[in-house]
Amino acid sequence: MVGFWQARAAAGTPAGAARWRPTDHGVKLERFAVRPEFRNQEIGGALLKQVLTDVRAKFPDAPVYLNAQLRAVPFYERQGFERVGEQFEEAGIQHFKMVLRRT
């Protein structure tokens, strides 16, 4: 099972996308992206909110985590994620593993 979400601008232009998948460690959020011309318009936050609603409906008690690029860490921290462990490299890009805090 994999979930895929796409955000579109008012004119129907693709603005962003994301997916999630269950793993042995919980539910991993992956491939979050917002096109540069649509950034800083709250699209990423709205997309993340919809993805989390979908994940919680299917896996209400599962831990939710992701690997965030360094530049995205502040965004995910504002959304309730916290860093876990040390910084690491994936595909030549520095990341932190982040886990959604339980509320």
Predicted regions and their residues:
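Hydrophobic beta-strand residues of extracellular immunoglobulin-like
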Residues: 1-7, 66
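Conserved beta-strand in the GNAT
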Residues: 6, 12-21, 28-33
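A conserved beta-turn-beta hairpin within the catalytic core of GNAT-like acetyltransferases
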Residues: 22-30, 39, 58-60, 92-94
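Conserved beta-strand segments that form the floor/walls of ligand-binding pockets within enzyme
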Residues: 28, 33, 65-67, 97
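Conserved acetyl-CoA-binding loop-helix of GNAT-fold acetyltransferases
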Residues: 34, 40-54
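Conserved GNAT acetyl-CoA-binding A-motif
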Residues: 55-69
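C-terminal "cap" of GNAT-fold acetyltransferases
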Residues: 67-71, 86-103
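Conserved acetyl-CoA-binding loop of GNAT-fold acetyltransferases
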Residues: 77-86
